[in-house]
Regions:
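Short, charged, amphipathic alpha-helical segments
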Residues: 324-328, 356-365
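N-terminal-proximal low-complexity accessory segments that begin disordered
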Residues: 1-47
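Internal helix-loop-helix
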Residues: 46-145
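Alpha-helix capping/hinge segments and adjacent helical runs
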Residues: 361-485
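Charged/polar positions within long, soluble alpha-helices
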Residues: 150, 313, 339-346, 375-382, ...
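FAD-binding core of flavoproteins
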Residues: 147, 152-296, 461-485
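Generic structural signal for well-ordered, non-transmembrane alpha-helical segments
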Residues: 35, 39, 136-139, 299-302, ...
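Extended amphipathic alpha-helical segments enriched in small hydrophobics
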Residues: 292-351
Length: 485
């Protein structure tokens, strides 16, 4: 089924405990830091019911004869991936910005665990059935699904058992109803989502230890008793929406999730204590989810290109060779991302679970390209936009009767670029490249799917080195013995 925006709002108005800026949130849907992004999320749901978008955003479930969201559909063909691209393009253009947490990028992590059914069956066949049931539920119930990965860390030179044991999420008790967990996780959008796929990120075990209370993964209801959401300060409302159009509409608030003896029903447990299952999910976690994650960065690249080119055109600088060179660098960055995404689906592979996974080497290489070059590309876009993004007065100054007169005079360029359009463009570019929100988003993109060194390690583990080795062996006339190492 597909839900409406109002149904989504009602589902998160469940009495969950949420704090922002030291105050407990009484009305989550109308809190100034959360309302804008909840409105965006509601819009995502409502779009699926509109004639203009329904065919692009949904598909017919042949078993239930109901419409389901394309975002959560397990991909089995290339067309499934192309349909996801179409749906995402419709969403981004409708809302006029970029959001990371749509659910497609986090549901994909469950597909990775689905591929590890043989590992789960060795642990407990019920866990394999649980993941299959939750994939079906995500497909048919249309929840806002997120992913809880990052721990508070603590002293990483010591095992969790040798410090405050709650620094890493762990099981403290088993009951007939399920497991009881303590600890904490950071998660984007948790405070206004329905459920999270919780999993370990750091091995809380040593050597060849096969069992650990820290090796646990489960689906958690974000309104569960004992769960506390402590949010970072929001960017919305710090300045006017006219001056900060992105920060005021697309701030996806991050949360420290505190698990204070939270009961997880057995049917929601995906694996427990077995380090082999934890190792598998860490190695394959982004097998599918890296695709929508990198796709989002492509849209960020489009915004940088558009903002930079408009800024160059308004003053006629787009005719200069040096300016075109930098614009071409932005275009190469964008097309490099797009090429990796396109090729990863064109050369997609069947997964162990029977799904169609993007070509891992190409996709993960594309992620490195997108993330590592993003700071450089933002700097180039900033150069192209020029210094006016840091010196232009705010919207109120343009509207003032006295100061507005002078701003109208000096910000009008010609009949095509009047003062108000220039002000809007400069405000957009400032929020995209220079604001607190822009800095936050840059750091988020660098670490959201693990740090840069882990991205490169994923490429190392998925690139086929046998071809280059064999090529050099033949070219250098080496014996077969060198291939046996």
């Amino acid at each position: 089924m597909i839900r409406t925006g109002n149904q989504y709002r009602e589902s998160i108005n469940d009495g969950r405990q949420v704090w922002i800026d030291g105050e407990k949130v009484k009305d989550i849907c109308n809190h100034p830091s959360l309302k804008p992004i909840i409105d965006i999320r509601s819009r995502m749901y409502d779009m699926a019911h509109e004639d203009k978008y329904q065919e692009k955003l949904t598909y017919l479930d042949e078993e239930t004869n109901e419409l389901n969201t394309v975002y959560h559909k397990p991909p089995r063909t290339r067309d499934d991936w192309y349909e996801k691209d179409t749906a995402m393009d419709s969403l981004m253009h409708d809302i006029g910005g970029v959001v990371i947490r749509v659910s497609d990028e986090t549901v994909g992590e469950m597909w990775s665990l689905f591929d590890g059914q043989d590992v789960l069956n060795e642990v407990d066949p019920q866990f394999a059935r649980n993941i299959e049931n939750h994939i079906i539920r995500a497909t048919r119930d249309d929840p806002f699904h997120v992913s809880a990965n990052t721990d508070p860390k603590g002293d990483r030179s010591r095992l969790p058992q040798d410090q405050d044991p709650d620094m890493l999420l762990h099981v403290v008790k088993e009951t007939d109803a399920g497991i009881v967990v303590r600890g904490a996780k950071f998660e984007t959008a948790a405070a206004y989502s329905n459920q999270a796929f919780v999993k370990p990120t750091i091995g809380g075990w040593a050597g060849n230890e096969k069992l650990s209370d820290y090796a646990v993964s489960f689906i958690c209801d974000m309104g569960a008793p004992g769960l506390k959401h402590i949010c970072r300060s929001g960017f919305s409302g710090r300045g006017s929406v006219e001056d900060y159009p992105l920060a005021n509409n697309f701030d996806e608030v991050d949360t420290l999730l505190v698990f204070d003896n939270v009961l997880v029903p057995w049917e929601n447990v995906l694996f427990y204590r077995h380090t082999s299952a934890a190792a598998f999910i860490r190695a394959t976690l982004h097998r599918y989810s890296a695709y929508p994650f990198v796709t989002r960065i492509r849209y960020v690249a489009d915004m940088m290109i558009g903002a930079a080119l408009f800024n160059a055109r308004q003053t006629g600088l787009d005719k200069h060779q040096a300016v075109r060179e930098k614009l071409a660098m932005l275009a190469c960055y964008r097309e490099g991302i797009n090429a990796h995404l396109t090729a990863s689906i064109a050369l997609a592979e069947k997964s162990p679970g029977g799904l169609l996974m993007p070509n891992q080497s190409l996709l993960l290489t594309g992620r490195v390209h997108a993330c590592t070059r993003l700071p450089e590309m933002m700097h180039i876009a900033r150069e192209l936009c020029g210094g006016q993004i840091c010196v232009t007065p705010n919207h109120a100054a343009f509207n003032d009767k006295e100061s507005g007169h002078w701003l109208e005079k000096f910000y009008n360029v010609n009949e095509n670029w009047v003062a108000e359009d220039r002000r809007k463009l400069l405000a957009f570019a400032r929020d995209l490249l220079n604001s607190d929100y822009a800095g936050h988003r840059l750091t988020f993109q660098l670490f959201a799917q693990s740090p840069p060194f882990a991205h490169l390690n994923a490429v190392y583990n998925n690139f086929d080195f046998s071809g280059p080795l064999d090529f050099v062996r033949n070219a250098a006339g080496l014996s077969e013995k060198v291939m046996q190492q």
